[in-house]
Amino acid sequence: MTDKNITKDAMYDAVAPDDFESMLELDRYNNRSSAFDKIIAATHDHFWDPLDTKYIDFDEPFDMENEPLVPEEMIAALQTDYVSNHLSDPKERTRFINTMVLHNFSSILHGEQGALNLSASLCHVLKDQGAQEYAANQTREEARHVTGFAKYIKTRWGRPLECGAVLKDLLVEIIHAPEVYKKIIGMQMLVEGLAMGAFASFYNNIRDPLGKKLLQLVMTDEAFHHKFGKIWADRTVPKLDPEEHAIIEDWAAHCFQTLLFNLVSPTQQMALYADFGLDGMKVIEEFQKVMTDDVRRESMRESANIFRVLIKTLLNAGIITDRTRAFYGMYVDMEELKLEGDRMVGDDIAEDGIRYLQAINFKDRVVESIRVAAE
């Protein structure tokens, strides 16, 4: 247990990645935490294989040339007169929308790869056997997400886009961080929270049945991954001293701001705009005119808004204090958010997905319905 890791519960005790000798301590074998047992046992309920057509068939067609994957209201740049007027041809407009979706799905794919590597790294540093088994299970699940999104992108577009510099830098920072709290807050709570918000938003709007099914299958896993971070917060945050809380709170705000910039900043799509004959700087200028604080706050009221999910995650975990409350208050009504309770957007979608998977995996047995990430 080290100050740098800010460990407040033995089940999150960690060692250096190259300290395998600590894993051979005899007392460690008899001190397995039971905190993750229900999440581990539930892996059978939400198992799926992206390479097995009984779960998902990537040969399902969709007219990418003539049908937009999502409503154009989801494409921020199209809310500007400059971009909307420039893309007057229906086919070119559709191509622009679907290319913007490719940008988002490519970011998701890179994020899933980051989650895979981070989960594997946790197996090397967490001492508790239960925590290790959970991390090993998540590693396997993230691997199928990488396969699933890679196959979907190949089917619909052929090839993903490069990982944006901002997202790449954050993923590298989280994965290489020696501090366990940085890994858990950065990935298990924020990147996974971002994923749940993004998946729910796309699930509710995507017109491609194949994309919709993939999103639901992935969400059945992500709901449990998000729970791992919540368990850490429940057992850690109440025991923090003011200095430790400030360290964790500042790290969370740093990750949030980075993810916000990566997703909504038009500077992240400059090359994409150029491919459509658009002046990237002009797009940014027009975007800033329409994206006022009032517009931003109103869009955040929608429960499926991606960053609303992130802020709610941090608020419910007790990480946000008066030090950073005003920062998050620029995007949401914090009092309104607090009154919503613990239920997260995407939970219902994930639970429906689990029932779908139970029907496939246990069709010869009567199974009890389960709630997502049960306590």
Residue ranges and their predicted role:
Residues A195-L240:
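Active-site-proximal binding-pocket segments
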Residues D128, E133-G158:
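Carboxylate/His-rich catalytic cores and anion/metal-binding grooves
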Residues V125, R140-E141, D221, H225, ...:
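A short structural micro-motif
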Residues G111-L118, H145, V191-A198, H225:
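Amphipathic, well-ordered alpha-helical segments in soluble domains
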Residues F149-F202:
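Active-site-adjacent scaffolding segments
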Residues E133-A136, K213-Q216, A246:
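Short, charged, amphipathic alpha-helical segments
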Residues M1-S119, H124-Q132, T155-E162, V166, ...:
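Terminal targeting/low-complexity segments that flank the catalytic cores of oxidoreductases
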